[in-house]
Swiss-Prot record:
Subunit annotation: Homodimer.
Pfam families: SPOUT_MTase
Protein name: Ribosomal RNA large subunit methyltransferase H
Gene3D superfamilies per the UniProt record, alphabetical: 3.40.1280.10
EC number annotated for this UniProt entry: 2.1.1.177
């Protein structure tokens, strides 16, 4: 299985990089994991609604340029579907069983994702209504992907 995580913005914090690298290493026995960073759109602190949409549109174009037609795409969104870890593990297993070997996860920038990115999604995925920095979300997501593979392998990692 090939897993791609497309994220907006560059990760600067060493502690996030180290955590993500650790899970990427652990996942290597189950899947090839690629993390693709696209530049975030520089914008002033206070934006009008139209300016916010323009920022999301530009970031969305960068995101969409990294997604191939054959990929099954999860977009992380507050309004997406929440899942338990076991349910997510079953979904990933079923995707592989039914021929989806290329799975992409999208983490938008601080304003979220554009309508075009959300329309491209096969599924909108929510980790709940909490607001988290998108840098932290990368670590949370890759840990949950690892947890899903461990659940599917029968490992005691998930208790």
């Amino acid at each position: 299985m090939n897993i791609k995580i497309v994220c907006v913005g560059k990760l600067k914090e060493k502690y996030f990089k180290d955590g993500i690298a650790e899970y990427q290493k652990r996942l290597s026995r189950f899947a090839k994991v690629e993390i693709v960073q696209v530049p975030d759109e520089k914008a002033p602190e206070s934006l009008s609604p139209a300016q916010m949409e323009e920022v999301k549109k530009r970031e969305g174009e960068r995101i969409l340029s990294k997604i191939k037609d054959k990929e099954y795409v999860y977009v992380l969104a507050i309004k997406g579907k929440e899942r338990a870890s076991e349910e997510f593990a079953k979904e990933l297993k079923n995707l592989g069983t039914y021929g989806h070997s290329d799975i992409t996860f999208v983490i938008g920038g601080s304003l979220g994702t554009s309508d075009a990115v959300n329309k491209r999604a096969n599924d909108l995925f929510s980790f709940g209504k909490l607001t988290m920095p998108h840098q932290l979300m990368r670590l949370v997501l890759i840990e949950q992907i690892y947890r899903a593979f461990m659940i599917n392998s029968g490992s005691p990692y998930h208790k």
